[in-house]
Amino acid sequence: MDDVSKCPFSGGVKGFKNKDWWPNQLDLSVLHQHSNLSDPLGEAFDYAKEFKSLDLDALVKDLHALMTDSQEWWPADFGHYGPLFIRMAWHAAGTYRIGDGRGGAGTGQQRFAPLNSWPDNANLDKARRLLWPIKQKYGQKISWADLFVLTGNVALESMGFKTFGFGGGRADTWEPEQDIYWGPEGKWLADERYSGDRELAGSLAAVQMGLIYVNPEGPNGNPDPLAAARDIRETFARMAMNDEETVALIAGGHTFGKTHGAGDASLVGAEPEGADIAQQGLGWASKYGSGKGGDAITSGLEVIWTTTPTKWSNNFFWNLFGYEWELTKSPAGAHQWKPKHGAGANTVPDAHDPSKRHAPSMLTTDLALRFDPAYEKISRRFLENPDQFADAFARAWFKLTHRDMGPKVRYLGPLVPKEDLVWQDPVPALDHPVVDDKDVATLKSKILASGLSVGQLISTAWASASTFRGSDKRGGANGARIRLAPQKDWAVNNPAELAKVLSTLEGIQKEFNASATGGKKISIADLIVLAGNAGVEAAAKKAGVDVAVPFAPGRTDASQEQTDVESFAVLEPTHDGFRNYLSGKQWLSGEELLVDKAQLLTLTAPEMTVLVGGLRVLGANANGSKHGVFTAQTETLSNDFFVNLLDMGVAWTPVDKGEHTFEGRDRKSGAVKWTATRADLIFGSHSQLRALAEVYASSDAKQKFVKDFVAAWTKVMNLDRFDLKA
C-alpha cells in the first residue's frame, strides 16, 4: 500500500481515540505505567545488584576524562564540559516539586518527551550524546538516572569543588511518565497557571510551561530583580529549598560556564521530538554561523558570570557586589545586565577564542540575590565567608539531586554520606529482636479486646500508611509519625479520636514491652499496622471468611526531632477518595483525585477498586461520613458496596450544584437508601471501573474479594518497607 496514512494498522493513522471523543473521560492509564511490557530488561532484572557490581572508581575516572575531551560536533565551552553536565544534572533533578513529590531525577525522564524537548532543556540532548559512549561501556550496571546525577557531581569535582556525596539506586523507566501535571498551557513558555496576585496553581512549581524554575530575564521577560526574587522564592520553596539553599544553588551553579545567545533565535530549528527523523533524536539545529561553539544559541542569553568559569571560586559574589549593573540585551535580543561605565572589561575569558576577553554579565535572576533584602543578607555572608558558601552549596546540591529518592536506606554505593539529614525523614535503626508469630497472636487478641472498633483500627492504620507517595518515596507507616506534629493534628485524621486510639495502642505496647522476654519489643509503628490487620481479619470473619493478613515487623518509631514539621506539612491530604474525604477548593473532580491518590500509592485499577469497596463497608470514612457506605452491616468485609452500587432498583441524583454528593433513592418508593460522592459513583459510571465492580459484585466473589482486599491492603501497609525489598 503506497499511502500508509490509510492503513488502519500503521503508526501513521490519525484516527480519533476515546479521549478525543470524550475529553472528560476518567483516565486510568496512569495506574498502569511502566509495566514489564515496556521494560527491555525484564522482571527479573535487579538494578541494585547490578549497581553493586559496578567499578565506580573506573567510571568516575572515565567521566573525569570526558570533561576535557572536546568533540568537534559540539565543542566544549572553555575546553571543559563540566558546566554543561552540571546543567544536565540540575535540570534532571530540578523538575521535582514538594506538592505531590513528582518530577526529579529518579527515573531518567530527561530522555523522554516532554522533558527532552522543553525550551529550558535546549541542547542538553548534546550532553546525553556525549555521555552515550560511557553509558554504552558500563551498560546496565549504571542507569541513565544515576549517570545524570553522578556526572554532575564529577563535573563539580573536576573543577575543584568538593561535593557532599552521591547515592545510587535510581532505576530507569522506559516510557514518559503520564501522571505528572506540567500545567494547563498548550504553548511553550505560556503562564496560564497563575491567578489573582500571581498565585501559582496546585502543585506546580515552575513559572512557565517548559521552564525548570523561573524566567532568567524576569517574570514574563520583565527585567525587574525584585519581581524576579518573588518568583524565585515561590518556585524554589515549592521545590523544597529555603532562602539559603536557593542563594547557594543559584550562585554555585552560576560560578561555572555560560549561557548561549550568540544570534537570532529564529534560526534555531525544532526540538528533538519535533525534529526530522534524520536528526536521530537531536534537536535545536541552528543555522546561525556554525551552529555550535561560539555560535551556539540555547536560552538566547549570552552571559559569563565569573573570571574562572571552569574553576570553583567566590567570584560570582565578587562580581555581583563589585559592580553596578545596567540593563542591556544579548545578541539574540534577551534582557541581561552588564557593569556600568565599561567596568570589568577584559576580565572574563571567551569560551572558544583565547584572543578575546569580555566583561562579566548577569541575569535578572542573579541580581535578585543582591537586591532582595533577605537574599542580599545571605549573599553578603557567603561573599565574606567562602567556606560557608561552599558547604551550603554542597549540601543544597546533594539535596537537589537526592530529594526524590526517599529515605537513606534506598541509597547505594560507597559515596553515601554518613550524616543523617532531616529532609531524608530518618527513622531509628532497629536495635532489638522483633515479635514472633506467638507474640503477634497475643497482641491481636489484646487489640480486639481493647474496646477499639474495627473501624477505628482500620482507619488509624490507613491514615498512617497511606501518606506514602511513590513519587518521592516519602510518608508511610514506618516511623509512626501519625503520633507526631503535624500529622496528629490533620483534620482528615479526626485528631480527637486518633488520640484515643493511639493512647490505647500505646498502653498495649508498653505492657507488652515491659513483659516480653529476650529483649523483644514492638514499636508503635508496627502495632498500628498490626491493629489494622487485626481489624481486617475480624471483619473478614464476620463475613464468613477466615484469613490471615501478612505482617512483617521491623518498623521503628521516629522522634519529633527527626521530623521536619514544615516539610511534612505538604503530605497532609486535602483529598483521600479511599476515606471519602475532600476539603476546600480542588482543581480536579473527586474521581480524578481518587485516581491521583491511587497512583501515588502505586496501585493498579483493580487494587484501587477493591480497596475502596472494602474500606467503605469497614467504616474507614473520614470523620464518620456515611457517603458510600452501601451496607447494613458495617465492619464486615463483604462485597455489599459493589452489590448495592450496581443495583438497578436505585436511582441517583445530585444534591448540590457542583454535583459532588448524591442521593440514591428506591425507584419504587422514592425513599433515600444511600448517599454517595463522585468517588463512589465512578465505579458504576466509568465503563472500565464498572467492569471491575461487576467482578466483585458477583455471587461467586466472596472469597476473591477478601483475598484481593487483603493483598492490596498489605501492599499499602508495606509501601515504605524498603528493607523488605532490598
Swiss-Prot record:
* Site of covalent link Tryptophyl-tyrosyl-methioninium (Trp-Tyr) (with M-239): 90-213
Query: What does the record give as cofactor?
Result: heme b
Q: Which UniProt keywords apply?
A: Heme, Hydrogen peroxide, Iron, Metal-binding, Oxidoreductase, Peroxidase
**Region labeled Disordered — which residues?**
334-359
Q: Does the keyword Heme apply?
A: yes
Q: Which GO terms describe its molecular function?
A: catalase activity; heme binding; metal ion binding
Annotated Gene Ontology cellular component terms: cytosol
The cofactor binding remark recorded in the entry reads: Binds 1 heme b (iron(II)-protoporphyrin IX) group per dimer.
- Tell me where the cross-link Tryptophyl-tyrosyl-methioninium (Tyr-Met) (with W-90) is found: 213-239
Q: Which SUPFAM superfamilies match?
A: Heme-dependent peroxidases
* Known catalytic reactions: H2O2 + AH2 = A + 2 H2O; 2 H2O2 = O2 + 2 H2O
InterPro entries per the UniProt record, alphabetical: Catalase_peroxidase (IPR000763), Haem_peroxidase (IPR002016), Haem_peroxidase_sf (IPR010255), Peroxidases_AS (IPR019794), Peroxidases_heam-ligand_BS (IPR019793)
Give the positions the UniProt entry annotates as the active site: 91
Q: What class of enzyme is it?
A: oxidoreductase
Q: What is its EC number?
A: 1.11.1.21
Q: Which CDD domains match?
A: catalase_peroxidase_1, catalase_peroxidase_2
Q: Which domain of life is it from?
A: Bacteria
UniProt subunit comment: Homodimer or homotetramer.
Q: What protein family is recorded?
A: Belongs to the peroxidase family. Peroxidase/catalase subfamily.
Q: What does this protein do?
A: Bifunctional enzyme with both catalase and broad-spectrum peroxidase activity.
What PANTHER family does the annotation carry? CATALASE-PEROXIDASE (PTHR30555:SF0), HYDROPEROXIDASE I, BIFUNCTIONAL CATALASE-PEROXIDASE (PTHR30555)
Put simply, this protein is called Catalase-peroxidase
Gene source species: Bradyrhizobium sp. (strain BTAi1 / ATCC BAA-1182)
Q: Which gene encodes it?
A: katG
